């Protein structure tokens, strides 16, 4: 286009106004229709989302995009669209790419952003699953270690318990034998004491019988040798008087002294006679 009317194509550059919109191409004023098209192209679609790292909030420096060589005819026609410079999306500003022969710069779309988010979620899920598996493995390892320690402790304490049990059984058997021996000794002594007691009782019975027999024989012999004799009391009258005097004079017993002297004289006389 324009090659038939212009024998030579020249390179052009663009300039921007305060709103960063292309207005001038090497001193050539753009038409209003071209400006409107650029406005329409620079508006982002409703379903389009900002891609992380490509918006204006990104702190990365914006690379300088060289302007491609565009052939411009010497006599521009108002109805013919003139090639425009790259839109703000090429410079890193938010917005979509314009449909036109401007540049071939590829910007990540919403689908690519969703893919990045999905991959990030998958990575997080994979990391979480790996951590969970690691925790489960650690728990299994700890449980196995505790089980091994318990089994080891049980195995170590089992011989001691067995030896202690054997010792207790031996001691119980020894004590049982000693108890049986003690019971047998007590039974033997009980039998011996009963025999001795029986013998002593028999001997005592024989002695009692013999002593009783001897006593009766001696009593019979004494009765046969000793003759009985009647004895009358001596001075019985004086005895009665003395007792009556003492009874009547409890606090004056000296009053009975004459009776006592008479009783003594009577007894002496009876002994002499």
Swiss-Prot record:
Residues 130-189 form a coiled coil. It comes from the Eukaryota. Component of the MICOS complex, a large protein complex of the mitochondrial inner membrane that plays crucial roles in the maintenance of crista junctions, inner membrane architecture, and formation of contact sites to the outer membrane. The keyword Cell membrane does not apply. A motif (Cx9C motif 1) lies at residues 235-245. Transmembrane segments: none annotated. Component of the mitochondrial contact site and cristae organizing system (MICOS) complex, composed of at least MICOS10/MIC10, CHCHD3/MIC19, CHCHD6/MIC25, APOOL/MIC27, IMMT/MIC60, APOO/MIC23/MIC26 and MICOS13/MIC13. This complex was also known under the names MINOS or MitOS complex. The MICOS complex associates with mitochondrial outer membrane proteins SAMM50, MTX1 and MTX2 (together described as components of the mitochondrial outer membrane sorting assembly machinery (SAM) complex) and DNAJC11, mitochondrial inner membrane protein TMEM11 and with HSPA9. Residues 232-273 form the CHCH domain. GO terms for cellular component: cytosol; MICOS complex; mitochondrial inner membrane; mitochondrion. Residues 40-59, 73-118, 150-181 are annotated as: Disordered. A motif (Cx9C motif 2) lies at residues 256-266. InterPro entries: CHCH, MIC19/MIC25, MIC25. The keyword Glycoprotein does not apply. One of its GO terms (biological process) is DNA damage response. This is MICOS complex subunit Mic25. Pfam families: CHCH (PF06747), MIC19_MIC25 (PF05300). Keywords: Coiled coil, Disulfide bond, Lipoprotein, Membrane, Mitochondrion, Mitochondrion inner membrane, Myristate, Phosphoprotein. Disulfide bonds join 235-266, 245-256. A lipid is attached at residue 2 (N-myristoyl glycine). Its main location: mitochondrion. The lineage of its organism: Eukaryota, Metazoa, Chordata, Craniata, Vertebrata. It is found in: Mitochondrion inner membrane; Mitochondrion.
